[in-house]
Amino acid sequence: MNFFKFTAIVTDHIPRALRQTFRLMWDRKFGPVLQHWDDSEAVRRSFAAMEGGTTTIPTHQSYEEWDCTALFQATIFAQSFALPDSTGHSKTLSGLYVKPLGLPRGRFHASVVSSGGDDYETVALAIDQLRLLRNSLFHPAKGEMSKPTFNQYLQLVKDAFKALGLKTDEIDGIGSEVGFPTSEVANLRRKIRNRNMAIYGLGVGVGLL
């Protein structure tokens, strides 16, 4: 059941966490000068315009429908939240804080809290950690996960949530469950199958999502 418990975290709880974080990021930066994120067509058009008018983020849809890939694109890969580097060039949060680390494939960030007290770096590292954890589920999924691996991943998720200022109560609840209803397992299997078909059918590298 460890695999399915982690799948539930990835498919249900991480997207919700990313939406909360995106909305908070937007409201902090654009709320006072533009408008707070109310998920209206108008605010989504404004976001699309800030991304250059052409974006892979489905801004024509409610952000409640955005999947993890879109939410990563809308946060750490978004031009809207880009910051200047030491030379004054604008870089996305991923480009500024994550890419320079050169993290090897299959590895996770040792810490998601900025050693220098940079809140933007903490947000970037925490979101990227969730991206790495999400990718691990589909790389490739065998339907099995050892208890030590599950415990490690669970702690990484909790650390990322805490760094983003999010509650971990529901994650703790999943960690303590002894099993899932058969119907829930079937639903999780379907989500994995559909996700794998989308990834490999399009020939998209998981590491790029």
Feature map (PLM): residue ranges:
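Long, hydrophobic or amphipathic alpha-helical segments
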Residues: 188-209
